[in-house]
């Protein structure tokens, strides 16, 4: 029996060695594409700043960040014991916090045109709307969770059009976008699993672009797709690897958050500036960014999935 086990182990080792030397063990084509696009890029001229939270507050696993019209910073994190929603001023001073016991996996946070704050839970698929002071105003149960045994099987992000339409990225298991009216009544849904136009493999982020179209970070397909608010496919840019986020600045500058498929999650993250008319990559910042917010002055606020609250301010 010992000899047989040794033979089995030897065969496994030989197979693993063969795979590592073969195309099957090589980098996947998407990762090769991403590296070919990002490696030649210049680093963007920014200053890295780490904000100190005052009074001292332990941030744990920052999942998403948003900013509001007052320049405040809204952080959604995953504390072991504390409030997941924290509002700070631009200097890092805590203004208020809330949400303890209301979340399983806090995932997305956004501010709507009226200044209200919305959160998305990736485990329960519950979307919550809060007033700027933290009073709960609305709850949307997205539902239709295919496999409740999975920790991540729910919604990921939310976006708004100026006329009050709400779009939820129901991304981890359902590969769809669900539209609601301002009262939380479901209007329609669109999208399905796959690699073709209008198909997704993890709808990880959604945002309304300068022209009013919906831009979606199709994470595992390594691309951005964009659509009309009614769900009609308009186009796509494929960058390869994993594409976590897409964001626009107040002046229309476009950024995406990228990561190769074949390395640890703490390595080779980039926030990349992209020409919004062509999809050409223009420059990058080396930082992990699960989600991304952009301040009114163009500062980048990456959600680092750590306790570090960072911003990257453009140099004047």
PLM features per residue range, with description:
Residues 11-22:
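Bacterial N-terminal signal peptides
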Residues 1-2, 26:
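Initiator methionine at the very start of the polypeptide chain
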Residues 27-316:
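Eukaryotic scaffold repeat domains enriched in small/polar residues
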Residues 2-13:
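Bacterial N-terminal signal peptides that target proteins for export
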């Amino acid at each position: 029996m010992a000899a047989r086990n040794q033979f089995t182990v030897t065969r496994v080792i030989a197979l693993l060695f063969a795979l590592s030397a073969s195309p099957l063990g090589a980098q996947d084509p998407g990762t090769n594409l991403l590296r070919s696009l990002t490696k030649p890029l210049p680093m963007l001229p920014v200053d890295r700043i780490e904000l100190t939270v005052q009074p001292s507050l332990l941030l744990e696993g920052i999942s998403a960040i948003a900013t509001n019209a007052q320049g405040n910073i809204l952080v959604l994190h995953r504390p072991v014991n504390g409030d997941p929603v924290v509002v700070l001023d631009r200097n890092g001073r805590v203004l208020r916090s809330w949400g303890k016991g209301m979340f399983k996996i806090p995932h997305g946070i956004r501010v709507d045109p009226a200044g209200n704050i919305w959160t998305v839970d990736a485990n329960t698929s519950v979307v919550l709307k809060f007033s700027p002071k933290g009073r709960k105003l609305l709850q949307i149960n997205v539902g239709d969770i295919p496999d409740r045994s999975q920790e991540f099987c729910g919604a990921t992000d939310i976006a708004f059009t100026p006329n009050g339409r709400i779009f939820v990225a129901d991304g981890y298991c359902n590969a769809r976008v669900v539209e609601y009216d301002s009262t939380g009544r479901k209007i329609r849904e669109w999208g399905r699993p796959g690699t073709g136009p209008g198909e997704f493999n993890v709808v990880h982020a959604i945002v309304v672009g300068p022209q009013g179209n919906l831009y979606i970070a199709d994470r595992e397909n390594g691309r951005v797709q964009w659509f009309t608010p009614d769900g009609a496919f308009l186009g796509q840019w494929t960058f390869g690897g994993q594409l976590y986020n897409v964001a626009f600045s107040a002046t229309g500058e476009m950024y995406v958050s990228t990561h190769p498929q074949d390395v640890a999650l703490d390595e080779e993250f980039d926030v990349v500036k992209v020409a919004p008319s062509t999809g050409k990559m223009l420059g990058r910042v080396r930082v992990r960014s699960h989600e991304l917010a952009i301040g009114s002055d163009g500062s980048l606020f990456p959600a680092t999935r750590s306790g570090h609250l960072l911003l990257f301010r453009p140099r004047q």
